Structures are given as structure tokens and as C-alpha cells.
Amino acid sequence: MRNDEMYLQLYLIRHGESMGNIETDEPFDKTNPPLTPHGKMQAKAVGERFAELKEFTLYSSPLGRARETASQISTEMIIDSDLLENGVRATENGFEDYYESAEECYARALKVIGKIRSKHRNHENVIIVAHGMFLNQLIKAALNIPCGAMRLSVYNASVTKINFCDDAPVKLALSNDVSHLKETDGEKLFWM
């Protein structure tokens, strides 16, 4: 690889388990559910996994469960409303549900990939913390898989790594990895 060619390692992380991922009678904000105690342990494990990665740019969805997960990696992060979950939008008063088709979500994911690839070109590590349904579309967009071709499982607190290089095809280097959760999860995985 030449020094002048673009090389980007993109890490995609789904937030830890949230109240919206479990069955509960406890009241919570359905649009912006907080992490469960288990989700907080998962977020901590994600932070520990990335502790050795010294140079990176961290992006997070503005929703609390993603920001809380991202904050375990670094307190310095870029909040990007394009990373919101499918069917959620930011308003002056917080967040609200609205209809967003899979195709519209995929178009938003393509926009995010284009933005990241144009902004981060020189041997960079970029970490995105977001949501299951959006990451499903983002992974497909990054790999040039059409929107409706397949549905991917994205576990809570999982890591997917995609490498971009000027002179090679996009590489799915790691998919839905939860090896850092062995202490916290055992067999308990939630996907969407």
C-alpha cells in the first residue's frame, strides 16, 4: 500500500442492551430508552476493547443509549443525527417516531458512508456507535449490497469492522463480533 492511497478502518458498534430490547413493565421513554444495567456492563466491555486504539474519530447517534455506549470509548465524540435509528428523528423537544422506509434509511446510510469516506482518507480509524436497524442498512451500504437483498443481525454491543482501500475491494474484516462480552453475556445476545 502506498502512503498516498486512502485507507480507512471503519468500526461499527451497536449500543448496549436498552430498555427497549427487553420485556419489562417498567415505564421508559419508548423513543429514547436508556441502557439497562446489563447494557451498561456491555458498554464498559466495548470501551475496554477499544482502550488500546489510540488514534480514532468517534461518531455517535444523539440518542442516549448510543451516546452512553460511545462515552465508554471516549468522551470526545461527534454527535451526528444521520446516525439515528430507523424511524426516529430529532426535534426541538427531543426525539419522535416517524415513518421512514427501509429505502429511505438505506439512502441515509449511503450518505453517511460517503461523508465518512470523503472526510477520513489517510490511514484513519473511525468508530460509529448507532442502532441495530440503521447499522443493518449502513453495513449493506458500505459493502454495496442492495437495500432489500438481505437482513443482517446486529447484536447489542457488537463490533463490525469494514476496511476501505483505494486499490482493493471493500473488505468485511469482522462481523457482529461479541468476543469482548464473554464475561458479561454468556449466551444472552439480542439482535435486530
Predicted regions and their residues:
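Active-site-proximal alpha-helix that buttresses catalytic centers in soluble enzyme cores
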Residues: 2-76, 97
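Generic beta-sheet signal
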Residues: 10, 56, 122-132
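Phosphate-handling substructures
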Residues: 33-34, 71-116, 171-176, 191-192
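Glycine-rich phosphate-binding loop signature in dinucleotide/nucleotide-binding domains
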Residues: 51-54, 116-124
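Conserved histidine-centered catalytic loops in small-molecule metabolism enzymes
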Residues: 53-81, 163-192
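Short beta-strand scaffold positions
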Residues: 60-61, 107, 129-130
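GST superfamily/GST-like fold recognition
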Residues: 132-136, 171
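Domain-level recognition of soluble alpha/beta enzyme cores
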Residues: 146-171
